[in-house]
Amino acid sequence: MKLFIDTANIEEIREISKWGILSGVTTNPSLIAKEGRDLKAVIQEITELVDGPISAEVVGETYEEMLEEAKELVRIHPNVVIKVPMTEEGLKAVSKFSEQGIRTNVTLVFSAPQALIAARAGATFVSPFLGRLDDIGADGIGLIEDIAHIFHIHHIDTEIIGASIRHNLHVMNAAKAGAHIATIPYKVLKDMVKHPLTDIGIEKFMADWNKTKK
């Protein structure tokens, strides 16, 4: 399973990119707004740090608005993927983008039927939201399993991005459920590196090593 980072913070991306683990980046309007910066400027900077798909979301609600926004975004860099909400207007846009060879990431997916429809419209990626499903007592990991099973049976090439990741367990369970990608917040990526036994082991090694210097 590939790892993306879910952020629009350039310093977070810069730091994690040095680990050599990132295959892509996802952003959304909320993350961009949090940074207080121009969307296109942020996306341009991200493309200079990560060589992989960079999802930039359209905010228009109509087919026409989505097409106009996408024209500007795809000019930034060939790695830009147009992120589109799972709506009827979004599906029309995804179909048109597919005809034009523009990659898309259909976001706000909360059911297997939504994922199937998005894939058949031509989506490159679909993003089921794990954390938000957990919030209402639904089974986000089970959803990824269902989508992966359907895509496998019917030889659908659309890739599944586990999104709305809240903790390490989401990442591991998404991998086991068949997600092709997990897009992970900065804090969760940092937590994935840590384990208390690792810290204890390092302390012991250093204590033993320091004894040899006496």
From Swiss-Prot:
Disulfide partners: none
Cellular component per GO, a single term: cytoplasm
EC category: transferase
A Pfam family recorded for this sequence: TAL_FSA
InterPro entries for this protein: Aldolase_TIM (IPR013785), TAL/FSA (IPR001585), Transaldolase_3B (IPR022999), Transaldolase_3B/F6P_aldolase (IPR004731), Transaldolase_AS (IPR018225), TSA/FSA_arc/bac (IPR033919)
Residues annotated as catalytic: K83
Stored CDD domains: Transaldolase_FSA (cd00956)
Catalytic activity: D-sedoheptulose 7-phosphate + D-glyceraldehyde 3-phosphate = D-erythrose 4-phosphate + beta-D-fructose 6-phosphate
Subcellular location: Cytoplasm
GO molecular function: aldehyde-lyase activity; transaldolase activity
Gene3D superfamilies per UniProt: Aldolase class I
Membrane spanning stretches: none
Pathway noted in the entry: Carbohydrate degradation; pentose phosphate pathway; D-glyceraldehyde 3-phosphate and beta-D-fructose 6-phosphate from D-ribose 5-phosphate and D-xylulose 5-phosphate (non-oxidative stage): step 2/3
Cytoplasm in keyword set: yes
Domain of life: Bacteria
EC number: 2.2.1.2
Primary location class: cytoplasm
One of the protein's GO biological processes: pentose-phosphate shunt
Keywords, comma-separated and alphabetical: Cytoplasm, Pentose shunt, Schiff base, Transferase
Matching PROSITE patterns: TRANSALDOLASE_1, TRANSALDOLASE_2
Function: Transaldolase is important for the balance of metabolites in the pentose-phosphate pathway.
Family per record: Belongs to the transaldolase family. Type 3B subfamily.
Protein name in the entry: Probable transaldolase
